[in-house]
Every structure is written in C-alpha cells, then in structure tokens.
Amino acid sequence: MATKTSKSTDDLGMTTALGTLLRPLNSEYGKVAPGWGTATLMGVFMALFAVFLVIILEIYNSSVILDDVQMSWQSLAK
C-alpha cells in the first residue's frame, strides 16, 4: 500500500487558546442553508457598488460636470 492512514490521537496537533476562541466560527462549516438565502441581497449590494464605481469613474474622467469643483491637486492644497 502506497499510503498509510493513521487514526491515532497523537496526530491531532497542538491545542491553542486562539484555536479554542476561533472554533465557534468554524462550527457551521459544510452546512448549506436551503434556498437562495441572502443571494438576492448580495446581488443588490453588488449592483449598488457597481453604480458607485461608475460614478467615481465618471467624476475622475470629468464626464460629469461639477460646478465649482476643481479637479487638480493644487485646489486641494488651498
């Protein structure tokens, strides 16, 4: 046999205080909520974030005309 599996308790590793504190965060591993869950909410926030990025890009490219807003580093120093 090429590989050997061991079920001994010596291979469990070291238990640390940090591992004990973080164990509850990993207790839901492998469990899947039925249905779509919060996927629609995530989609809404992704769409809002995309709109935000487009607005920032348009301001950066001066595609959106903003009155009385200077787009230079010198205006920030005043």
UniProtKB/Swiss-Prot annotation:
Residue numbers bearing the Phosphothreonine modification: 3
Alphabetical keyword list: Chloroplast, Membrane, Phosphoprotein, Photosynthesis, Photosystem II, Plastid, Thylakoid, Transmembrane, Transmembrane helix
Post-translational modification: Phosphorylation is a light-dependent reaction catalyzed by a membrane-bound kinase; phosphorylation occurs on Thr residue(s) in the N-terminus of the protein.
Annotated GO CC locations: chloroplast thylakoid membrane; photosystem II
Keyword set includes Cytoplasm: no
Stretches that traverse the bilayer: 39-59
One family name in Pfam for this protein: PsbH
Record's subcellular location: Plastid, Chloroplast thylakoid membrane
GO MF, one annotated term: phosphate ion binding
GO annotation, biological process: photosynthesis; protein stabilization
Top-rank taxon, per record: Eukaryota
Bilayer topology: Single-pass membrane protein
PANTHER family, sorted: PHOTOSYSTEM II REACTION CENTER PROTEIN H (PTHR34469:SF4)
Family of this protein: Belongs to the PsbH family.
Quaternary organization: PSII is composed of 1 copy each of membrane proteins PsbA, PsbB, PsbC, PsbD, PsbE, PsbF, PsbH, PsbI, PsbJ, PsbK, PsbL, PsbM, PsbT, PsbX, PsbY, PsbZ, Psb30/Ycf12, at least 3 peripheral proteins of the oxygen-evolving complex and a large number of cofactors. It forms dimeric complexes.
Protein's job: One of the components of the core complex of photosystem II (PSII), required for its stability and/or assembly. PSII is a light-driven water:plastoquinone oxidoreductase that uses light energy to abstract electrons from H(2)O, generating O(2) and a proton gradient subsequently used for ATP formation. It consists of a core antenna complex that captures photons, and an electron transfer chain that converts photonic excitation into a charge separation.
Identification of the protein by name: Photosystem II reaction center protein H
Organism from which the protein derives: Tupiella akineta (Green alga)
